[in-house]
Amino acid sequence: MSKRDYYEVLGVAKTASESELKVAFRKLAMVHHPDRNPGDKEAEIKFKEVNEAYQCLSDGQKRAAYDRFGHAAFSQGGAGGPGFGNEFGDFMSDIFENFFGDGRAAPGGGAGRGRGGAPGRERGSDLRYNLEISLEEAFAGKTETIRIPTSIACETCSGTGAKAGSKPRTCSTCGGYGRVRAAQGFFAIERTCPNCHGRGEVVDDPCTACSGAGRVNRERTLSINVPAGVDDGLRIRLAGEGESGMRGGPAGDLYVFLSIKPHPFFQRDGADLFCRVPISMVTAALSGEITVPVIDGSQTQVRIPAGTQTGKQFRIKSKGMPVLRSREVGDLYIQVSVETPQNLTKRQRELLQEFDQSASDENHPESAGFFSKVRDFFVSGATRA
């Protein structure tokens, strides 16, 4: 069967640039790769055809020979048929590693390249710990002792997984690389070694303490420094305090996620604190002093001027939360709420009625002004009608 024109195979014009050839090749390689079309012989043939066409046209000398003589340039005795040398294999390895994510080797390429360093060494998993603290603890900072279940390196075998007096041997299937290459006709695919499962080593006599895993489950006790000024949702990273790595690999990290309990008095907004304080009608009308709490456990006095209304806010400087890793401190805001008297005695009712009868608009400027505006609104509306 005659070969198809290489430009036709890649779907490009004879004047295609090097970048256009590369784009076309990558697109077709993804479509026809055997791992994406298992058992599809037609896809396998097309994949070979695409590889062959690209290797020829991406090489300046071979392309010039092909443009002049066609496929005859690579027949026996000619310039040499397309093959996959190491330099092309390296390029293909990069392409397929990016496309398929597992470091598959390219057709005819050289030795594959591992993604995790030495075969068998695995980084330990990261761990998460949720820690709830009070607002007072967030204000002052604290050292918290926590206990976490985790996996640590087996002390009996020092993490090797092998019984005392023995040691793991290099996997004979992959030669310690952790991956094997399987030839499929014109190309080769690199996969995780089925014998050692990518570890590069095999344990013939496993440690009885860890059953060959190299790690054992334990509960660890750690001290965590919670700095003053932390906020809800803050994450603290403790490097190397996660699970131990496998077979000498590095340990993972521990992430502590902080949450702050709701406070009965204070609401927080950044470094500022807000506290709602009820005051009596008499204090609001005649003035007075009230005692309010402070987050550090102390108390302070706030002067309430005569005629204070509900919602009035008083600022107390530097009585809020500290700013994390700073010398700055937020403020405390006291918002008053005037309480209406309840359960009045007969005499109290009489006194209030007497006050109401003697009161004028000057005593209630806000309500008097409001009802005056309402009256004017309806009067003007009736006039327009």
UniProtKB/Swiss-Prot annotation:
Subcellular location: Cytoplasm
Record keywords, A-Z: Chaperone, Cytoplasm, DNA replication, Metal-binding, Repeat, Stress response, Zinc, Zinc-finger
Protein family (similarity comment): Belongs to the DnaJ family.
Co-factor binding details: Binds 2 Zn(2+) ions per monomer.
InterPro entries: DnaJ, DnaJ_C, DnaJ_domain, DnaJ_domain_CS, HSP40/DnaJ_pept-bd, HSP_DnaJ_Cys-rich_dom, HSP_DnaJ_Cys-rich_dom_sf, J_dom_sf
Function comment: Participates actively in the response to hyperosmotic and heat shock by preventing the aggregation of stress-denatured proteins and by disaggregating proteins, also in an autonomous, DnaK-independent fashion. Unfolded proteins bind initially to DnaJ; upon interaction with the DnaJ-bound protein, DnaK hydrolyzes its bound ATP, resulting in the formation of a stable complex. GrpE releases ADP from DnaK; ATP binding to DnaK triggers the release of the substrate protein, thus completing the reaction cycle.
Cofactor list: Zn(2+)
GO aspect biological process, one term: protein refolding
Residues where Zn(2+) 1 binds: 154, 157, 207, 210
SMART domains assigned: DnaJ
Protein name: Chaperone protein DnaJ
Domain J: 5-70
Predominant place of localization: cytoplasm
HAMAP family, A to Z: DnaJ
Domain notes: The J domain is necessary and sufficient to stimulate DnaK ATPase activity. Zinc center 1 plays an important role in the autonomous, DnaK-independent chaperone activity of DnaJ. Zinc center 2 is essential for interaction with DnaK and for DnaJ activity.
UniProt zinc finger (CR-type) residues: 141-219
S-S bonds: none
Binding site for Zn(2+) 2: 171, 174, 193, 196
Keyword Metal-binding: yes
Entry's Gene Ontology cellular component terms: cytoplasm
